[in-house]
Amino acid sequence: MLKMKKRLRLLVFAMMIVALITVQLPLNQAEAAPAFAKGTDISWVPGLEAQGYTWKDKNGTTKDIIQILKDDYQINSVRIRVFVNPSSNYANGYLDMNRAAALAQRAKNAGMSIMLTLHYSDSWADPGQQTKPAAWNSYTFQQLMDAVWNHTRAVMTAMQAKGVTPDWVQIGNETNNGMLWNDGKATVSMQNYAWLVNTGNNAVKSISSGTKTIVHLAGGNDNALFVWNIGGLISNGATFDIIGMSLYPSATDWSAKVDQTISNANDMIARYGKPVIISEIGLEYNQPAATKSFVAAIKTKVRNISGGKGLGVFYWEPEAPPGYNGGYNKGAWQANGQPTIALEGFLN
């Protein structure tokens, strides 16, 4: 009996140790990514809903926007941006890590895969502005890297708390000339830019080794830009998994620009051995037929990239009503709350 009790105590102790170790381990696998991502950025949804916006399907029935995207347009993935300390402005701020995590949980519960876009800014980061968060303004470069590490891990932990492990995380957004200016401006110091990318990449992997990281540039048809930026990062030791691209053509030049983007994608794959994802696309709201054709063409051509190296296509904020946020007109919903035919390009 004494031996039995001793064995039981040892067994319980061993189980406690295993439990403690398990709690401390990072998430090892992301959610199962789709074979090909048909995606939409839906980051404006929480702010629009807070203002009372609702959406209808093509039959005029009011439904949850995520469900409409999934059921009517075969959308299987969503993209969600994260600001550091955003203002309460619904369009240009609002989406801190907690609101982003709640939206990600909602999308995951609908069966979606998740891409996060870490702007490392309090508001928009894009080719024209890569502004440090106000709280980081006085930091040394080492402190800036520490802040990137801590913020990235905090975002991943907030996602984990909601039961979400992102499939993809962008380290910055449209970082054509680097990030966190001026310290991480590529024309000032490509090495600093590479170190910041590495810091973000390593922070993501410390929480979820299976999550894929992305460096994302605008102008997907601009091969010279990508060779300079991506090549510069790699030559300075940057580590990341995927090359992301944006493409916003017009109704008259979209076909040529799609072909240029596919040519660039194939060149990136050949040069650097990394797959490509189209992180953002959009075309004029009032050209729905052209937009549908554009979406169908880029979806098909990315999906047909050799070796499965074209991972997917994401339409940026299709749920935006016409003229939202001072004039954004590349959405796919009408003023009456019903969709245009634009997203039908994702079908099949």
Label each PLM-derived region with a short phrase:
Residues 90-101, 125-231, 236-240, 251-263, ...:
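Active-site cleft segment of glycoside hydrolase catalytic domains centered on the general acid/base Glu
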Residues 43-45, 83-85, 119-123, 171-176, ...:
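Active-site beta-loop-alpha junctions enriched in small/polar residues
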Residues 33-113, 119-148, 154, 170:
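N-terminal substrate-binding region of glycoside hydrolase catalytic domains
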Residues 50, 54, 267-273, 284-348:
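Aromatic-rich peripheral "rim/lid" segments of glycoside hydrolase catalytic domains that contact
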Residues 34, 64-74, 102-113, 157-164, ...:
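Acidic (Asp/Glu)-rich catalytic clusters
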Residues 19-29:
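C-terminal segment of classical bacterial N-terminal signal peptides
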Residues 40, 117, 169, 243, ...:
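Conserved, mostly hydrophobic/aromatic
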Residues 2-15:
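Bacterial N-terminal signal peptides that target proteins for export
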